A protein has these predicted regions:
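C-terminal beta-barrel architecture of Gram-negative outer-membrane proteins
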Residues: 647, 780-880, 895
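Surface-exposed, low-complexity loop segments enriched in small/polar and acidic residues
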Residues: 129, 233-239, 277-313, 319, ...
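Extracytoplasmic beta-strand/coil segments of soluble accessory domains associated
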Residues: 73-120
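N-terminal periplasmic accessory domains that precede
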Residues: 72-75, 79, 100-103, 135-138, ...
Length: 933
């Protein structure tokens, strides 16, 4: 399949332009001088030629409607340049749950700047992986979008921090007159995942003739859930033995009998403070039904019963825009918006093992000192010696069975407490619900003052995310209930009172807030005539004030619940900037540009970023272009403010406790999990980048446009978590009478500037329209991105991620495919338009180079160790019933292709939701109607 797809792309990108030249041309273009001068994303200077020195993709509202895309997130995730680190709301374990982010060039969501009408938005109140700030593209309305411009080039010299990989500028309608309503209704071929969208816009007045225009828009979206268990093949099962893998269902013992597993009824072992276990290991408590008692000696339960391929989501957006002429020179534009979105994450039942520390991470005072807790709670569950569920208690009904299991050595365990290892499937499943409201007010004043085109802007954006947690067990409440016998495990779990669960796992809430206030002023004018046009200059300044307050889940912040992926952040960030830009058409065929910007941060210091561009029209049909830019990203509040994030990871070997003669545990010897507390560092420096692009624009005839661009980005001073060093870990107290240190409780690792990365590749894009005479028009579109290199350098060691499933530590282990792209063929004849789009993602080798040349578990059931490529077909049609009514139809994943098996990712189960979601959803049908009056 991948060879055929490669051939298809080669044909479309190289052969179609030649086919187009043989067709009848459409009407000629107007002379360039008659075109209106506009501002293209990446510059503050007006121009008539939309092909600038920097590569810019433009997606119009018509393009979006044809594809049946119903959200900005859907639009941006179809970009071929969106790669590793991209974030979708389908990632059930995301720290930034309920949100979506775009990652141009695979440089993560914090390296892509998202603008609305050229202005910044407040970042989502929850940071990606507890660290990276980003704008939630899933909450932005689609009904008022005129176009989306994607600048695939560094632009810090124009826009400041975060624009290392590029800029997404969502441009809304400048004015609207009349009434327009549209509705879309969709469902999968399995009659689930129902999607609804309603949008209505009303406007009156004309800015040119009436001196004003006012329009209002309301948009509603709803998407029903799709359960994992309702899909076929490996999507709805964790027993992957038929596919050459292992049985990963809950309760399967993955080793010798007695090896602990998260069984449905639990397993126990005598509590020995030295860490030693009996040779027989853990004993399975009675209570497992005959159908769940499995071949491995465990008790099966199915995690897929709780998982969602697509969570339920809902959104409501309200927008008003008032444009008013003020005298002969000034125009005022006031935009008011409220965006509301709701989503949820379903996790698995609470699972407990013997020992991961529940790290407290509340802050004390303004100096950012962590609250000290010398005896933190852990995920270790201990059944007291007198518990009736403890099989080492002679009064327990399990005593006889345990005695038979352990044999002659059982007498040594009688009367001891017991370690419990298992899944508490009787307690309601963990669910996190997100309700985000974004309020935005922006005022733009524009005027032509003499030769200066001037813009003054001010705005305020406030994003609030209310989070509701259910099903998360408090360690203190659980241990208390075990101690007094009110909570039972094993076959006695059915004796628990439903009211007890409200004490063990109460519903809790917190509200995270992110806000942005800004003021900006910029002006541009021609300076002097040059042979190719006017030398033009732009100057400007802006000020921004950012606030973030995420208090965290109230029990997680004091280390009382096991919530891998919880975090706390609070702080402010102020920045003041000044910039200038020059555009010099030195010859009719040669354009040069330069820009420079200075940003002053209250904590990160001062950054100076220049940019240079050149475009040379070699012949009328061929132009060459290139850019060179410096960029930077200031540390976010979650990285440098009063903040911390708790998670767990594979434990490194502890040489102080893992060795001959030491009473080590599996965790001491690198065979378990350990808690990690990532802490902020106020001394962080900004990340810096150097980027350049080299490209060509080829237009053999007016109906064909082909662009190809090489990009190369080197980022230094990257902000990462410090390595796990056992000598710096937080340990338990040394046991009396011993000469070795206590066990590691957790690692407290600050963020540091410690890595660099290099990303390079090619973008190719083709647009070709040619006449079929009386049969209408045929349009061919193709775009692709090929990654040559995606390398991270840490302590001098290079890790090459391009074409692999790594880096697995990033945003749900999205992976880094070398190639993404699509090919579209569209036929239009009078009121009818029919098209098809072939989407492609290349295969990925099943290794994470940072973990060594080892095939990650079950990435593929064959010895080649790779995740297969994914190709799927979409089709769409439009019929203009009357000049006022347009009917649309779309089918996504027409052939119902399954996504490739991928167990390296933890963003989804057995597939990659960030890149292959249409495969998991399956064939999806959508019908829409648009009415315009």
């Amino acid at each position: 399949m991948s060879h055929w797809v490669t051939g298809t792309f080669a044909t479309c990108l190289l052969g179609l332009p030649l086919v187009g030249t043989a067709q009848t041309s459409g009407p000629p273009r107007e002379p360039q001088s008659s075109l209106e001068a506009i501002v293209v994303t990446g510059s503050y200077i007006r121009r008539t030629d939309t092909e600038s020195p920097s590569p810019v993709d433009v997606l119009t509202s018509d393009d979006i409607a044809k594809r049946g895309l119903t959200s900005i997130a859907d639009v941006l995730h179809t970009l071929s340049s969106d790669n590793s680190g991209t974030l979708t709301s389908n990632f059930s374990g995301a720290m930034a749950g309920g949100a979506s982010g775009v990652s141009l060039r695979g440089l993560t969501v914090d390296a892509t700047l998202v603008l609305v009408d050229g202005h910044r938005m407040a970042t989502y109140p929850l940071a990606d992986d507890g660290q990276r700030p980003f704008v939630d593209i899933g909450s932005l309305p689609l009904g008022i979008v005129d176009r989306v411009e994607v600048l695939k080039d560094g632009a810090s010299a124009i826009y400041g921090s975060d624009a290392i990989a590029g800029v997404v500028n969502i441009i809304t309608k400048k004015q609207f007159t009349g009434f327009e309503a549209s509705t879309d209704l969709g469902s999968s071929s399995k009659a689930d995942g129902l999607a609804q969208r309603l949008s209505a816009t009303y406007g009156f007045g004309d800015l040119g003739t009436d001196q004003h225009n006012i329009y209002f828009n309301v948009e509603y979206r709803h998407q029903a859930e799709i359960k994992q268990e309702d899909r076929g093949s490996y999507l709805n099962q964790l027993d992957l033995r038929p596919y050459g893998g292992s049985d990963l269902r809950g309760g399967i013992v993955q080793g010798d009998p007695g090896t602990p597993a998260y069984t449905a009824v639990g397993m126990v072992a005598p509590l020995d403070r030295s860490g030693a276990l009996p040779a027989q290991g853990y004993y399975l408590l009675p209570g497992c039904s005959a159908q769940n008692l499995n071949y491995s000696g465990g008790c099966t339960w199915d995690p897929n019963l709780y998982k969602k391929i697509q969570p339920r989501s809902e959104g409501l957006d309200l927008t008003a825009k008032w444009s008013q002429k003020i005298g002969d020179r000034w125009t005022s534009t006031l935009a008011l918006s409220m965006f509301q979105s709701e989503s949820e994450q379903w996790r698995q039942p609470n699972q407990y093992l013997d020992g991961t520390t529940l790290v407290p991470f509340v802050w004390a005072g303004a100096n950012g000192t962590l609250v000290d807790q010398t005896n933190p709670a852990t995920t270790q569950i201990v059944l007291p010696a007198n518990s009736l569920d403890n099989p080492f208690n002679p009064a327990s009904p399990y005593f006889t069975g345990a005695k038979a299991y352990y044999g002659a050595g059982f007498a040594n365990y009688v009367g001891k407490a017991a370690l419990f290892y298992g899944a508490l499937t009787d307690i309601p499943v963990q669910i996190t619900k997100y309700r985000t409201q974004v309020y935005r007010v922006v005022e733009d004043l524009t005027a032509t003052l003499g030769d200066w085109d001037t813009t003054l802007s001010a705005g305020f954006v406030d994003a609030q995310t209310r989070i509701t947690y259910t099903g998360f067990v408090r360690a203190s409440a659980l241990n208390a209930a075990l101690a007094d016998g009110t909570y039972r495990v094993g076959q006695n779990a059915n004796l628990n009172s439903p009211s007890l669960y409200q004490t063990l796992a109460p519903e809790t809430h917190d509200t995270a807030i992110s806000s942005l206030a800004f003021f900006s002023a910029n002006a541009s004018r021609p300076l002097m005539p040059l042979p190719g046009g006017d030398l033009a200059i732009a100057v400007g300044a802006d000020a921004r004030l950012t606030r973030l307050n995420n208090p965290g889940e109230p029990y997680a912040t004091v280390g009382d619940i096991a919530m891998d992926g919880s975090f706390y952040a609070k702080g402010t960030q102020d920045v003041y900037s000044a910039f200038t830009e020059l555009s010099a058409p030195v010859l009719p065929s040669l354009e040069m540009s330069a820009a420079a910007r200075v940003d002053r941060y209250n904590a990160a210091g001062t950054a100076f970023t220049p940019k240079f561009g050149i475009k040379w029209k070699v012949i009328p049909q061929l132009a060459l272009r290139g850019t060179f830019a410096r960029g930077f990203r200031a540390p976010g509040i979650a990285e440098s403010g009063n903040s911390s994030a708790a998670s767990s990871t594979f434990a490194p070997l502890d040489p102080a406790r893992c060795g001959a003669g030491l009473p080590s545990t599996p965790t001491d010897c690198g065979q378990g999990y350990v808690a990690v507390l990532s802490t902020a560092n106020p001394n962080l420096k900004p990340e810096h980048s150097r980027s350049y692009t080299l490209g060509l624009i080829f237009e053999p005839v007016h109906s064909i446009n082909f662009t190809a661009d090489y990009f190369n980005i080197r980022r230094t001073n990257e902000i990462v978590g410090a390595p796990l060093d056992p000598s710096q870990a937080v340990r338990a107290a040394q046991a009396p009478g011993t000469n070795y240190p206590g066990a590691i409780l957790y690692y407290a690792t600050p963020y540091i500037n410690d890595s660099a990365s290099l990303t390079s590749g090619f973008d190719g894009e083709l647009r070709s329209t040619f006449s079929l005479g009386a049969l209408g028009y045929l349009t061919a579109k193709a775009d692709a991105t090929y990654l040559i290199e995606s390398t991270q350098i840490i302590d001098g060691t290079e890790y090459h991620y391009a074409g692999t499933v790594g880096p697995t530590a990033l945003s749900g282990a999205t992976g880094t495919p070398r190639t993404r792209g699509s090919v579209t063929l569209e036929w239009s004849y009078q009121p009818v338009t029919i098209g098809a789009t072939l989407n492609y993602r290349s295969h990925m080798y099943g290794v994470d180079p940072s973990n060594g040349p080892v095939c990650l578990q079950l990435t593929d059931p064959n010895p080649n160790c790779y995740v297969a490529s994914f190709t799927y077909l979409d089709m769409y049609a439009q019929y203009r019933v009357t000049p006022k009514i347009l009917v649309t139809g779309n089918v996504t994943n027409v052939t119902n292709r399954l996504p490739p098996l991928n167990t390296a990712t933890y963003g989804g189960t057995n597939y990659n939701p960030s890149l292959d979601q249409p495969g998991a959803v399956g064939t999806f049908f959508q019908l829409g109607v648009n009415y315009r009056y």
